[in-house]
Amino acid sequence: MMILTKNKPMIVSMGPHHPSMHGVLRLIVTLDGEDVLDCEPVLGYLHRGMEKIAENRTIVQYLPYVTRWDYLATMFTEAITVNAPEKLTNIQVPKRASYIRIIMLELSRIASHLLWLGPFMADIGAQTPFFYIFREREMIYDLFESATGMRMMHNYFRIGGVAVDLPYGWIDKCLDFCDYFLPKINEYERLITNNPIFLKRVEGIGTVTREEAINWGLSGPMLRASGVQWDLRKVDHYECYDELDWKIQWQKEGDSLARYLVRIGEMKESVKIIQQALKAIPGGPFENLEARRLNQGKNSEWNLFEYQFISKKPSPTFKLPKQEHYVRVEAPKGELGIFLIGDDSVFPWRLKIRSPGFINLQILPQLVKGMKLADIMTILGSIDIIMGEVDR
């Protein structure tokens, strides 16, 4: 699209330390007055070589690193890191562990969407929700802290299960949170959704058609807001999501408002999933001890340290077979995947990360061309990126 300019174009550098930048992203924007002619994202300020680090760490040693990709939804990065070797070596996860994982993942999804909503609203001029979301998010972090010992960077998932069982009274506490949180989402909607100033800022801004969304390889709310009913929890049938009753949240418009509505709807569905999982959670082990037995071989005894209950223990280290496998989960921002190649060694031969933020960000220059300067923040905010996973 060729845009005729009235004056000499001006080049402005937004970021990498701009208050609305959501991390260290730099945008080189070419302006004609207030109109955006071109936009070039500059990435790599937070690149730490995560894929190379994985090649000389065992999966267990690598687990604390992965929580630094998308540091606002760390349960998902942990889930994908343990799912890959589980699928590669065909380790089954006990039912209870699978339910615990679902509960943790959905709580993490709500926390991530809350911390998207607050700054997104602040970017377009509404300060109030920014303070509200921290109140609810803090409660989720309290639940995480009592179950995993950490507010963020939980290091909770293990190959074949989870690190430690849910503490006494946690399920009741979590159900109380769900009962408290559902009316709060309705409160956000009353405050935001029909606000005329908010609608002026987001309706028709950053529109992505269904074909564009598919061709650009978008995923998550970016894809579902463009009329594509695609959710990996339904498509890939991982964990026990099929046993619970929930619906895919989607919209047809494809603009910033549609992406907002999808995420609000997802928070409601997540609460529904958590409530059902808490009520249906079975008893039994929270980890697969078969993985430990494989590690011990024939010398395994019933009263070894490996089988004693001692808070959070590391997973056993075992060799990854000479195979390759792609595993993905539906993270809050989209399809988070790992392509893992084993080499009969305890270290992965290659661990490729498919981060949703990186791929969703590619469409940004196309969306902002021809828009006003102020719309850049709306569009960038509606994409929802975390630079930790974009730069890896």
Curated annotation (Swiss-Prot):
GO biological process entries: photosynthesis, light reaction
Looking up InterPro entries in the UniProt record yields: NADH_Q_OxRdtase_suD, NADH_UbQ_OxRdtase_49kDa_CS, NDH1_su_D/H, NiFe-Hase_large
| Gene3D superfamilies recorded | Cytochrome-c3 Hydrogenase, chain B
Pfam families attached here?
Answer: Complex1_49kDa
Molecular functions per Gene Ontology: NAD binding; oxidoreductase activity, acting on NAD(P)H, quinone or similar compound as acceptor; quinone binding
Give the location in the cell. Plastid, Chloroplast thylakoid membrane
Write down the EC number: 7.1.1.-
Q: How does the annotation summarize its subunit structure?
A: NDH is composed of at least 16 different subunits, 5 of which are encoded in the nucleus.
Entry function: NDH shuttles electrons from NAD(P)H:plastoquinone, via FMN and iron-sulfur (Fe-S) centers, to quinones in the photosynthetic chain and possibly in a chloroplast respiratory chain. The immediate electron acceptor for the enzyme in this species is believed to be plastoquinone. Couples the redox reaction to proton translocation, and thus conserves the redox energy in a proton gradient.
The name this protein goes by in its record:
NAD(P)H-quinone oxidoreductase subunit H, chloroplastic
What's the source species for this entry? Answer: Marchantia polymorpha (Common liverwort)
User: Its encoding gene is what?
Assistant: ndhH
